[in-house]
Amino acid sequence: MKKIICLCLLMTGHFIHLFAQGIKKDTVYVGIYITSIHDIDFKQKEFATSFWLWMRYRNHEFDFYNNLEIPSAKSIEKSFFTIDTSGGQVYLQMKLQCVMKDSWRISNFPFDEQKLRISLENSQFDANSLVIMPDTAGAHFDRRFTLRGWKIDSCIISSGKRVYETAFGLANGGKQLSEYSNFRVRLSITRDAGGLFWKMFLGMYLAFLITFICFYIHADSMDSRFGLSVGSLFAVVGNKYIIDSSLPESSSFTLVDTLHGLTLFVILVVIAANAHSLRLIKKDKFKEAIKFDNKIALVILILYVLLNFWFIWQAKYGK
């Protein structure tokens, strides 16, 4: 009798455990077709996108039209939705316009590569209730749409689990952890930076050239040498502030910081070289001053060009 009672208790506990698991898992097949990406805003760390989204599943309670959640979206607008419940399953198709929040990698700006991410899940049913699988058939973005200034490298879709370190106030056996199956899109883009680079750094390079020309101003005009060099110094600082105003704050040292820092250092070296030339002139060593100017000018020009080439090459190809 005791064995029978123990067996009944064991079976009862097993059935209670099964009941606690909730409804049986259902597979949701999700597909996406991106029609537009625009308004990429580096300062606000966001971009806008439009895409078609479709889903196929059997459990009507999932109600993805009302329960769809895009965690990283700043705003979501739904339009042109279709729901078909024939054949014992639900087919949902809708078009979404979203403003997405994202983080940017600006260390190699403007020769940067970015990854735009979209993630979606069901806000009411966790991973114990549904499993999302990507619909990989066909293309995932319209190759005809133009993302001005960028080149689309790839579009990868996948599925996974998003873990929340909370039970959202529910009794979860004391475990403060929730898992939700999600659908992920990762769009890799590369900036077409040729024209943008010269547009941003032309002022800096002109400031360097003006400073470099100071070596060929006659020794009688030392005031002009120092005046042009100091003016170039402020021009480089101003150029950097203009570029920084369009970029998000970053704690890392970027290509923009490197090139401007190099130029500022070179201008300071030129000012120091002019001071040394002035000292030679005051000692009536005009020939030595001219020879020094010619040598230091050549060394500075070669080093500046080589270092610029190296840093730019590293940013563009050494990723």
What are these regions (language model features)?
Residues 1-4, 303:
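Positively charged n-region of N-terminal signal peptides that target proteins for export
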Residues 4-13:
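Sec-dependent N-terminal signal peptides
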Residues 15-20:
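Sec/Tat signal peptide C-region and signal peptidase I cleavage site
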Residues 21-188:
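Soluble non-transmembrane domains of integral membrane proteins
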Residues 184-303:
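Channel- or pocket-lining gating/hinge segments that regulate access to a cavity or pore
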Residues 310-319:
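Juxtamembrane boundary at the C-terminal end of a transmembrane helix
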